[in-house]
Amino acid sequence: MLDAIQWDADLIRRYDLAGPRYTSYPTAVQFHDDIGPFDLLHALRDSRKARRPLSLYLHVPFCAHICYYCACNKVITKDRGRALPYLEKLEREIEIISRYIDRNQPIEQLHFGGGTPTFLSHDELRRLMQHLRQHFNLLDDDSGDYSIEIDPREADWSTMGLLRELGFNRVSLGVQDLDPEVQRAVNRLQTLEETRAIVEAARTLQFRSVNIDLIYGLPKQTPERFARTVAEVIALQPDRLSLFNYAHLPERFMPQRRISVDDLPSPADKLAMLQNSIEQLTRAGYRYIGMDHFALPDDELAIAQEEGTLQRNFQGYTTHGHCDLIGLGVSAISQIGDLYSQNDSDIASYQQTLGNGQLATRRGLHCNADDRLRRAVIQQLICHFELRFADIEQAHGMVFRDYFAALWPQLQQLDRDGLIELGAEGIQVRPAGRLLVRSLCMLFDRYLNDQVRQRFSRVI
């Protein structure tokens, strides 16, 4: 079966390396400061000429409480008044960007991320969605994939009703862990009842899909405690579930310095949590999509993987990878054709630049032919666990074995170790290699070296 996983502890220990999650290739680590607003506007014109469908990502950076594990770009504040000045600059960015696209380009996908998007008041959410509808071709028939990240502590039934009214049909809930001791250790107190209430509201209001995020490897977690959390989440029957590995990088993310290393689970316990979780989810009928994602068989991700159309971008696994992605807001990333661009990550600088009527594009890169080739290889492996050489050769005008000749001994070693099946026609990731597909993809990453690896989490 496509979703089958074989647990091999020895292989996992050998290939559990630090490396990218490949929501893009090249990864954001390679972005440079030579990319600016002109590059973005030129790419938008090309998108308009090609009439490509669009995906919008809006970043709302505010959180009322700090979660010690968090590595997101965020602003911690209880001052709700800080949202309005940011919203005004976000609206200005929307206005500028909209001049360079065709109003007939449909917005097939929309995602509000953060931070905590529901930090915005109901009136502010209404205002923002109205502004988007004025300047972009948002779909009115509920056929779009319109999602928002929700902190169950910051939402209630009225919030959910408003979101459904505004056109959102998918929600993603941050849960991470339901054990009170773990929650205290990461400063995120959230009851099962709060989470259940939001899931029930989503079902009653006919949201199309509910996703729940969990993290293993947090302080005070044990295999037994985390198994209880997974069981409680399974009982809520989310359509999708993300199971992230906590990466403790306190030298990069200041909030993580409040976590004591002594409270973190051992590598053996982390492996046990992952193994137990996979077994629990599999028994409950969830399919392994890849990396850290699971979905019910009738979910669009599972169907797309079955049909060979699943893709991956900055929003994770997606059925809309064919869309040009426009990122709006502080630190937001766009992927338009062969251009990656990112807005300023400092909120004060972002707001000042937009206040002057200019886009806040600060960095990015243009993909070359080699980038496009390697991106296609990584995309195929990470989404479908297989690669047909002929498809890549036809699309990119090369001979796979010759182009990647230097990698062949390493690929043969992966074959001997049981991670892949390397044949004359392609690569098939075996069940024992699916949890380690990132390690396979790293072979094709020409930018990766030991110094770069230190900036990423481990595979498991």
Spans of features found by a protein language model:
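Flexible, acidic/Gly-rich N-terminal and inter-domain linker regions that tether
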Residues: 1-54, 103
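Short, amphipathic alpha-helical interaction segments positioned at domain boundaries
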Residues: 434-460
